UniProtKB/Swiss-Prot annotation:
It is an enzyme of class 3 (hydrolase). GO terms for molecular function: GTP binding; GTPase activity. Keywords: Cell junction, Cell membrane, Cell projection, Cytoplasmic vesicle, Endosome, Golgi apparatus, GTP-binding, Hydrolase, Isopeptide bond, Lipoprotein, Magnesium, Membrane, Metal-binding, Methylation, Nucleotide-binding, Phosphoprotein, Prenylation, Protein transport, Tight junction, Transport, Ubl conjugation. It comes from Canis lupus familiaris (Dog). Its main location: membrane. The gene is RAB13. GTP binds at residues 17-18, 20-23, 40, 66, 121-122, 124, 152-153. It comes from the Eukaryota. SMART domains: ARF, RAB, RAN, RAS, RHO. This is Ras-related protein Rab-13. Its EC number is 3.6.5.2. The modification Phosphoserine is found at residue 178. Mg(2+) binds at residues 22, 40, 63. The modification Cysteine methyl ester is found at residue 200.
Length: 203
């Protein structure tokens, strides 16, 4: 019987409360969007298998929604994480400023060399933008990581972001060729759909 997957990667989403972490996970794992989640309740984790570089990668994506204030609880989640996605809300400048604190948290708690990815969520709310894309690109380049602007509501760049992180983990682990698959840090793939408006405020 064929194996269901070649690799299992544990991913973790961190960031301030209300930036849309749970919505991103639900969009990625179930391709659905619901803005009625209760902000203090996380979903633990969701699983989705993706094809990357000819390999079946099972992604176990952990949510930390509602636990941002309990640093010790969140610390336990770092254990075993191979990739960490830092999420901010493009309409909330404070959530972007706090990315530096989350970077520090990764350094203190996560495994050395863990892959990281920066996501600016809710990019469908362009009219309410407070964080310019150039600011995020600069930050991503300073840390040598990739950056995407996403929308859990319109699904923009969600699959691309998760697959990109999975590919980086795979290549780093020597699971496949390491040629030109890497995209320069600080870039995203496609512009966000500005027609939709996001109401998801959950972690």
């Amino acid at each position: 019987m064929a194996k269901a997957y070649d690799h299992l990667f544990k991913l973790l989403l961190i960031g301030d409360s209300g930036v849309g972490k749970t919505c991103l996970i639900i969009r990625f794992a179930e391709d659905s969007f619901n803005n009625t989640y209760i902000s203090t309740i996380g979903i633990d984790f969701k699983i989705r298998t993706v094809d990357v570089e000819g390999k079946k990668i099972k992604l176990q994506v952990w949510d930390t929604a509602g636990q941002e204030r309990f640093k010790t609880i969140t610390t336990a989640y770092y254990r075993g994480a191979m990739g960490i996605i830092l999420v901010y809300d493009i309409t909330d400048e404070k959530s972007f400023e706090n990315i530096q604190n989350w970077m520090k948290s990764i350094k203190e708690n996560a495994s050395a060399g863990v892959e990281r990815l920066l996501l600016g969520n809710k990019c469908d709310m362009e009219a309410k933008r407070k964080v310019q894309k150039e600011q995020a690109i600069k930050l991503a380049r300073e840390h040598g990581i990739r950056f995407f602007e996403t929308s859990a509501k319109s699904s923009t760049n969600v699959d691309e972001a998760f697959s990109s992180l999975a590919r980086d983990i795979l290549l780093k682990s020597g699971g496949r060729r390491s040629g030109n698959s890497h995209k320069a840090p600080g870039t995203d793939l496609k512009p966000c759909d500005k027609k939709n408006t996001s109401k998801c405020s959950l972690g």
